[in-house]
């Protein structure tokens, strides 16, 4: 039965020693884990279990906390990425950073919290401007906005950028009904707001390896802040 296959696959995966500092071994372990999963639901269950474990990671010994975080980072997060489960991937990334580099995590979080009210205000203003623009052009849509995660900002800092040089920490996602509307929305956005050169990415015509589809761009708002904007259909987001 399906249940028996899932239970047996999970049992095999749970016996694996997943911790590895070596990239080659981590890649091998990911392949083994995928190979042991006769049903993709096994990987979803494993990721859900690991997310629960990481959320309660504080309850175990510090040495084991870091070991579990490193294991998650090298083996399980790439699998979440491959499956396109971005919500789990993002939360795991933040939790892993918290347990592997707590000082870095807390420093970024403290800086974010100091400017959070201003960031949220700017985000809401941009949402209103975009909403008015799309309504004026008769487009059915939904907009969601967010301040980027601690891990996302950490990755930018890791490239050598200074905190004062990081402007693109505000992101908006626009959902529309048809693929043609995605391109129409991008055209309207670029006509009203100045786009950042070389930041437009068409993942609809050229999907990512995990079949992720969306249009990405970055624009300057009227206040000079930088906003990352993603446009996709509801179907592409499923």
Where are these regions (language model features)?
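Hydrophobic or amphipathic alpha-helical targeting/insertion segments
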Residues: 1-11, 85
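Nucleic-acid processing machinery
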Residues: 15-43, 50-238
């Amino acid at each position: 039965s399906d249940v028996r296959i899932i239970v047996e696959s999970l049992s095999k995966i749970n016996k694996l020693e997943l911790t590895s500092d070596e990239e080659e071994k981590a890649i091998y372990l990911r392949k083994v884990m995928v190979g042991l999963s006769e049903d993709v639901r096994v990987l979803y269950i494993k990721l859900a279990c690991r997310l629960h474990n990481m959320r309660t990671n504080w309850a175990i010994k510090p040495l084991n906390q870091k070991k579990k975080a490193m294991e998650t980072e090298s083996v399980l997060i790439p699998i979440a990425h491959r499956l396109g489960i971005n919500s789990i991937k993002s939360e795991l990334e933040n939790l892993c950073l918290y347990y592997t580099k707590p000082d870095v995590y807390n420093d970024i979080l403290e800086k974010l919290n100091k400017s959070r009210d201003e960031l949220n205000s700017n985000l809401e203003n941009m949402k209103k401007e975009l909403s008015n623009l799309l309504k004026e052009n008769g487009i059915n849509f939904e907009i969601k906005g967010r301040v980027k995660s601690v891990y996302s900002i950490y990755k930018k800092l890791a490239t050598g950028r200074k905190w004062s040089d990081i402007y693109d920490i505000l992101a908006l996602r626009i959902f529309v009904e048809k693929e043609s509307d995605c391109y129409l929305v991008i055209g309207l956005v670029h006509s009203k707001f100045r786009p950042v050169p070389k930041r437009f990415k068409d993942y609809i015509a050229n999907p990512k390896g995990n079949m992720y589809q969306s249009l990405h761009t970055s624009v300057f708002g009227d206040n000079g802040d930088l906003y990352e904007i993603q446009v996709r259909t509801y179907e592409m987001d499923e």
